[in-house]
């Protein structure tokens, strides 16, 4: 892994620690943030929101492509093994259930956002917006597509996309405002 591309490695607390240990700690920290963000619901209109996609955006913007991918794979593995990391619990059923497409979409989105960040797309608000909006589209496209294969595509749009647009726009705006600042802090 190219250490210069992992912004979070620049923190002084990691100086002198073996890179493999750092990577493991970052993966565990990422899965912890994903779990907490899946469990905590924030009142919002028209439906309550979790901050899970926001955490995906931050992981993608601050971790390397490989580390961000491994973090999401570890998160899915923890859930598949029965750990209650997902919004409604854990177990292999969540990887094939109605929301599985969103989970797989987050895994692809974090890699895409990380790739953009490694190409300099986290250095400005506009570039951050581009990478985050692409990531969000990936999450919802896969989520709605998979959900639609179960309940029908019209219902999937009505239940799995439209109610979440306001809260997703809020999370995108928050991430776009925060990522360039994080990049400056972590340099």
Where are these regions (language model features)?
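Helix-loop junctions at the membrane-solvent interface of multi-pass transporters
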Residues: 36, 40, 62, 89, ...
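Short helix-perturbing small/polar motifs within transmembrane alpha-helices
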Residues: 2-15, 28-29, 36, 92-140
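Generic alpha-helical transmembrane segments of integral inner-membrane proteins
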Residues: 28, 32, 36, 58, ...
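Membrane-embedded alpha-helical hairpins and interfacial helices in multi-pass inner-membrane proteins
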Residues: 122-187
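Interfacial aromatic-anchored transmembrane helix boundaries in multi-pass membrane proteins
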Residues: 38-48, 76-109
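Hydrophobic transmembrane alpha-helices
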Residues: 2-69
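Hydrophobic alpha-helical transmembrane segments
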Residues: 24-29, 54-58, 68-73, 99, ...
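Interfacial loop-to-helix junctions that mark the boundaries of transmembrane helices
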Residues: 16-19, 45-50, 91-101, 129, ...
């Amino acid at each position: 892994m190219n250490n210069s591309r992992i912004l979070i490695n620049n923190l002084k607390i990691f100086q002198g620690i073996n890179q493999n240990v750092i990577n493991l700690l970052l993966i565990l920290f990422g899965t912890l943030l994903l779990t907490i963000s899946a469990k905590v619901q924030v009142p919002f209109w028209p439906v309550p929101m979790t901050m899970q996609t926001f955490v995906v955006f931050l992981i993608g913007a601050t971790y390397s492509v490989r580390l961000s991918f491994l973090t999401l794979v570890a998160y899915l593995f923890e859930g598949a093994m029965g750990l209650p990391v997902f919004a409604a619990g854990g177990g292999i059923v969540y990887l094939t259930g109605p929301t599985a497409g969103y989970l797989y979409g987050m895994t692809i989105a974090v890699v895409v956002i990380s790739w953009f960040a490694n190409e300099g797309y986290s250095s400005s608000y506009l570039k951050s917006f581009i990478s985050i909006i692409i990531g969000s589209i990936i999450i919802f496209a896969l989520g709605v597509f998979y959900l639609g294969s179960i309940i029908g595509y019209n219902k999937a749009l009505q239940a799995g996309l439209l109610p979440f647009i306001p809260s997703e726009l809020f999370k995108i705006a928050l991430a776009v405002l925060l990522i360039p600042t994080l990049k400056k802090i972590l340099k």
